[in-house]
């Protein structure tokens, strides 16, 4: 068991406050149109159990399944075979605090595309840094 816990890699986590109402941020993370505008093309429906795909460009269609929906505060979905992506929203007057959590990282695993989790986690961590800024531009426009 200790080997399993040592192999677990820390979740990627970003918290940012957007100058936008919670409904606008919710639409950006919980609708296919919104998510496509700043992340990846997809066919998301914010309904628990809904299976959908993210179009991961050169990696192809990545299967996902919605696991938790609490509008407009929380959306979680499984992504690929190992990951979970969660968006937590908190209303702050006329602003919104978003916490993005990308979990399910394990040093002993590889993605469905054959890539080891450890270097992919580092790459994705940098990618999320840019994507939360892209989301900011979308919701604050």
Regions found by a protein language model. Give the residues of each.
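Beta-strand/loop substructures that line and gate deep hydrophobic ligand-binding cavities in soluble
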Residues: 81-126
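Short beta-edge strand/loop motif at the mouth of beta-sheet-based domains
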Residues: 6-7, 13-14, 20, 24, ...
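Hydrophobic pocket/interface hotspot
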Residues: 25, 35, 52, 66, ...
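Hydrophobic/aromatic beta-strand elements that line small-molecule binding cavities or substrate pockets
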Residues: 16, 64-68, 84-91
């Amino acid at each position: 068991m200790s080997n399993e816990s040592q192999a677990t890699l820390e979740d990627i986590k970003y918290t940012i406050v957007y100058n936008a109402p919670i409904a606008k941020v919710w639409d950006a993370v919980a609708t296919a149109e919104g998510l496509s505008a700043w992340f990846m093309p997809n066919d998301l429906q914010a309904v628990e159990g809904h299976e959908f795909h993210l179009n991961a460009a050169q990696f192809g269609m990545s299967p996902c399944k919605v696991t938790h929906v609490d509008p407009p505060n929380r959306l979680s979905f499984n992504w690929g075979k190992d990951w979970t992506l969660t968006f937590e929203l908190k209303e702050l007057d006329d602003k919104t605090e978003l916490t993005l959590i990308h979990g399910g990282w394990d040093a002993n695993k590889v993605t469905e595309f054959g890539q080891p989790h450890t270097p992919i986690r580092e790459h994705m961590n940098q990618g999320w840094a840019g994507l939360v800024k892209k989301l900011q531009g979308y919701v604050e426009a």
